[in-house]
Amino acid sequence: MTNQTPMMQQYLKIKSQYQDCLLFFRLGDFYEMFFEDAKVASRVLEITLTKRDAKKEDPIPMCGVPYHSADGYIETLISNGYKVAICEQMEDPRQTKGMVRREVVRIVTPGTVMDQGGVDEKQNNYILSFIQSASMYALSYCDVSTGELKVTHFEDEATLINEITTINPNEIVVKEAIGESLKRQISLTTETITVLPDISDVKYDVNTTNDSHLYHVTQLLLDYVYHTQKRDLSHIESVITYEAVDFMKMDFYAKRNLELTESIRLKSKKGTLLWLMDETKTPMGARRLKQWIDRPLIQKKQIESRLDTVDQFINHFIERDTLRGYLNQVYDIERLVGRVSYGNVNARDLIQLKHSISEIPNIKNLLQAFDEQMTAQFEALEPLDDLLNLLEESLKEEPPISVKEGGLFKTGFNETLDSYLEASKNGKNWLAELQTKERQRTGIKSLKISFNKVFGYFIEITRANLQGFDPTEFGYHRKQTLSNAERFITDELKEKEDIILGAEDKAIELEYQLFVQLREQIKAYTERLQKQAKVISELDCLQSFAEIAQKYNYARPTFSEDKTLELVNSRHPVVERVMDHNDYVPNDCELDKETFIYLITGPNMSGKSTYMRQVAIISIMAQMGAYVPCESAILPVFDQIFTRIGAADDLVSGKSTFMVEMLEAQKALAHATEHSLIIFDEIGRGTSTYDGLALAQAMIEYVAHTSHAKTLFSTHYHELTTLDQSLACLKNVHVAANEYNGELIFLHKVKDGAVDDSYGIQVAKLAHLPVEVINRVQVILDAFEQSNNQTNNKNTMNHVDIPTDKNLNASSDEVTEIKATYYVDNEQSAATQHAKSDGQFEQAAFDLFDSPAKQSEIENEIKTLNLSNMTPIEALVKLSELQKQLK
């Protein structure tokens, strides 16, 4: 380090304190990066990597970005998971002898972005921390841009993971390193995990109901936030304590499978429930809507309160339309307040704040048209006339973005400022008059008086007009020679310049001071403004519910006390929207305490998965307090929704499709209650037919005898349909389809009863598989069916000889015949009830473990073999004999 220049020594010293960050080191008009930081930044930002001291043996890699456009570059680095430490010059280089003092003034991390362009206005930007003790987990999270701060605790890791995936933080702070298994699961949400082993002695004022775990996890989070931001964050609200059990529970897979906020295929908002329901007019309302989708209510009183408000908005559609107009003029009050506190607010932001609070009286007056209950619900809406007057009297309507270049305040706001501006204005008028006078005096019509920051004011004459011109005759002193012009000054011009520029500089400096004072005055309104933002966001969500309810003809749900679920002409809200409404086929669903399992059969592509999803989504919408896409809807209040839909490997955790399926099924079977909803789509596909069939049947029986959860179970195992003979709680339904002239027609209608055909070949035709494959499938299928029809003994395993299709084996001339052997168990499903000691019963849809007689004899023979006394040749001979017996 001693071999480095003083500037590089300063850089290395500062960098040593911020090893986990890319250091933006201010040098004049640029932020420079060196060494590995430069290599990373040049690659991610796609900027040129150069070298400092290129002529030396070991030049230093470097790159840089202009300070005035740094925000965009920082945003790119943050979006790629990096942290950026911003190191500024703390002294004016022009007035400093020796090395300029530099300090890191802020660390930008994925969870602490405050710049307007760095965050999605319709998404929260959360940073989260959690700690673990012997008996519990404590978790706290914050959106630094809005000031939201919440904390909770729970006992198990599963709830921790559910909370993290629900909150979806961009950054996580922990006190100590976490295990690899937990880290892999968390990585589904974020890979930015910071270990902060030492907490400062600063104690932050947080109200955590004297719970030490909640206190310490909140201290950990705030310590990191203040350490990185290094400035006032007074807008961060008093911490709100909540319980995870106060909301409907859905894990990461349930939310993904139901596509609540992100589509599986596009990985975007489009095509999701959030996309459908977002008729909000404010960024605050959009963020609140996502929170409500992620956390449906389970308290009936709270749900009904929201529904009552939606009902009011539907019945007052003129007032609702007027309200939407008012809300459209409201900007992001939450984040505007955050920037006021943070100190990066500009004058245009404050004009947005002014327009926003000017709509509050209009909104409050409009609510008088509704009933007293609704008016009381939003009584916290408070006109801020004093703040509105302050902003109205002070700032120009269209101020510049920069707060350090003047032009911010209205005439009359400050007398001293007015005097400076008047002097500057008079000076400029004098300059205009001087330019006219000099043109007349010299006879040069193109003469002009201009200004730049290097020379100040000057007279410019083009070279074409200089021929025969004697500057001294007019008292001109040459200042600069250009290729096509000469620049001059006069004593009079220089004297006036001092007056004009002095006034301008003083005006700009005073305006900045006044702006800082104004910002501090607005800080006093932080808590009141945040209350207004909360009320407006809720109003926005509820009017959005009313808007979509009326637009798409939704119905108000009612909630049953006896666990009844009755949906009449229900639709999938998203699918219905993306297709012609008249083409969508609505369906009913009716479950209660006695019949709580639907076993759903039907062809592939017929709509089984869509039907099951729509029941789950309708339940979520209802518990959000929204109307639902049905003719009528009676629902229980669900505590949890479990899903297993579709096939997906969990590559992050190293789990196969089948393992993921089993893990999701395990969660449902272990944790579902009689108040839960389970969606199982074709459980058992990822293993052998018998294994899958046995698993599916066992899971159905388990739900029937234990949790009694409302369950929709789709399957292609048609043997399961006889379960309705032994399980009174199970009802067979199917999604209908017709075959006409060899073509499969999907009716998409759910009807009572089971079907015994999945129409696999017809669906394969619709997928345009090669005709040779389709024909071959039919040959093989005919052979299987013929063998079954010829067999009467249920304990006989049939050998099926299938004719070879030589067209499919043309690559080998030597092969003339292939025999495919398929053993078909012709046992018919017996409605045999096996009594249990406790009086319960279980039914096998078919006997999974009954072996043919011949096979049992061979098994017994194998069991009696003394393998220790057999030579390899004897064993091979015996194996050959057994094989012949099976044939």
Swiss-Prot record:
State the UniProt keywords alphabetically: ATP-binding, DNA damage, DNA repair, DNA-binding, Nucleotide-binding
Recorded GO terms, molecular function? ATP binding; ATP-dependent DNA damage sensor activity; damaged DNA binding; mismatched DNA binding
Would you say which domain of life the source belongs to?
Bacteria
Q: Key word DNA-binding present in the record?
A: yes
Which InterPro entries is this protein grouped with? Answer: DNA_mismatch_repair_MutS, DNA_mismatch_repair_MutS-lik_N, DNA_mismatch_repair_MutS/MSH, DNA_mismatch_repair_MutS_C, DNA_mismatch_repair_MutS_clamp, DNA_mismatch_repair_MutS_core, DNA_mismatch_repair_MutS_N, DNA_mismatch_repair_MutS_sf
Q: Which CDD domains match?
A: ABC_MutS1 (cd03284)
Record's GO cellular component, any one?
cytosol
Q: Which residues bind ATP?
A: 602-609
Q: Which cysteines are joined by disulfide bonds?
A: none
Q: Which PROSITE patterns match?
A: DNA_MISMATCH_REPAIR_2 (PS00486)
One GO term of the biological process aspect? mismatch repair
Q: What does this protein do?
A: This protein is involved in the repair of mismatches in DNA. It is possible that it carries out the mismatch recognition step. This protein has a weak ATPase activity.
Q: Which family does it belong to?
A: Belongs to the DNA mismatch repair MutS family.
Q: What is this protein called?
A: DNA mismatch repair protein MutS
Q: What gene codes for this chain?
A: mutS
